[in-house]
Swiss-Prot record:
The keyword Thylakoid does not apply. It catalyses: a 3-demethylubiquinol + S-adenosyl-L-methionine = a ubiquinol + S-adenosyl-L-homocysteine + H(+); a 3-(all-trans-polyprenyl)benzene-1,2-diol + S-adenosyl-L-methionine = a 2-methoxy-6-(all-trans-polyprenyl)phenol + S-adenosyl-L-homocysteine + H(+). The lineage of its organism: Bacteria, Pseudomonadati, Pseudomonadota, Gammaproteobacteria, Enterobacterales. This is Ubiquinone biosynthesis O-methyltransferase. Coiled coil: none annotated. GO terms for biological process: methylation. S-adenosyl-L-methionine binds at R44, G64, D85, M129. It is an enzyme of class 2 (transferase). Keywords: Methyltransferase, S-adenosyl-L-methionine, Transferase, Ubiquinone biosynthesis.
């Protein structure tokens, strides 16, 4: 698959793209702006691999891959990974880091909707992590992910719940008090309630299998997966073979 630039960018927020392009050079700095992503990556990788019955030999699409943190970790598990993003700078960082690390990943600058038009039913696993809250039309992304996965395949989403606790934890706490991520990273209006996400899933051939919360304890400085989806949460869906 050739890396190419999409010209049909109806579901792209240029302001969101600019935010991530501004800090792209520090994507792989373990103590930089993306430190939380590096910290949670082993948790989400293990959860994805567990519910996908392993990743070895599978064709995987990472939607909203950014600088490639999750993409690389899945490739190291033996997956054949394509990373999809609309940010030119993060993709350049991802390509260079993969080259330096000796990992083979195909990074493509394209919207998920256009990719779905060209590669429907081509992937065993689709991941869309920490991306839905950064696009104008997350429902469209969910539908595109459902189109891209093969019957019998798995699709994983993660995002932030929309409520007062999430605002306090993810914006006031993480951006202003603890300064875990840059100010302005998130917009509470773009957060997505689990019921909304699952309604979009129900409009597709996907069916919910698992939902789990991602929790941070500022006293221990540790992340964990546990029940409770008040703030960050992940959803595993499966596309039935008969659909």
């Amino acid at each position: 698959m050739k890396a190419e630039q999409n010209t049909d960018a109806h579901n792209v927020d240029r302001g969101e793209i600019a935010k991530f392009e501004a800090v792209a050079s520090r994507w792989w700095d373990l103590e930089g702006e993306f430190k939380p992503l590096h910290r949670i990556n082993p948790l989400r990788l293990d959860w994805i691999a567990q519910h996908a019955n392993g990743l070895f030999g599978k064709k995987v699409l990472d939607v909203g891959c950014g600088g490639g943190i999750l993409s690389e970790s899945m490739a190291r598990e033996g997956a054949n990974v394509t990373g999809l993003d609309m940010g030119a700078e993060p993709l350049q960082v991802a390509r260079l880091h993969a080259l330096e690390s000796g990992v083979n990943i195909d990074y493509v600058q394209q919207t998920v909707e256009e990719h779905a038009d060209r590669f429907a039913g081509q992937y065993d696993v689709v991941t869309c992590m920490e991306m839905l809250e950064h696009v104008p039309d997350p429902r469209s992304v969910v539908h595109a992910c459902a189109k891209l996965v093969k019957p019998g395949g798995e699709v994983f989403f993660s995002t932030l719940n929309r409520n007062s606790k999430s605002w306090l934890m993810a914006i006031v706490g993480a951006e202003y008090i603890l300064r875990m991520v840059p100010r302005g990273t998130h917009d509470i209006k773009k957060f997505i309630r689990p019921g909304e996400l699952l309604n979009w899933v129900d409009e597709t051939p996907l069916r919910e299998r698992h939902i789990i919360g991602l929790h941070y304890n500022p006293l221990t400085n540790r992340f964990k997966l546990a029940p409770g989806v008040d703030v960050n949460y992940m959803v595993h869906t499966h596309r039935n073979i008969t659909d």
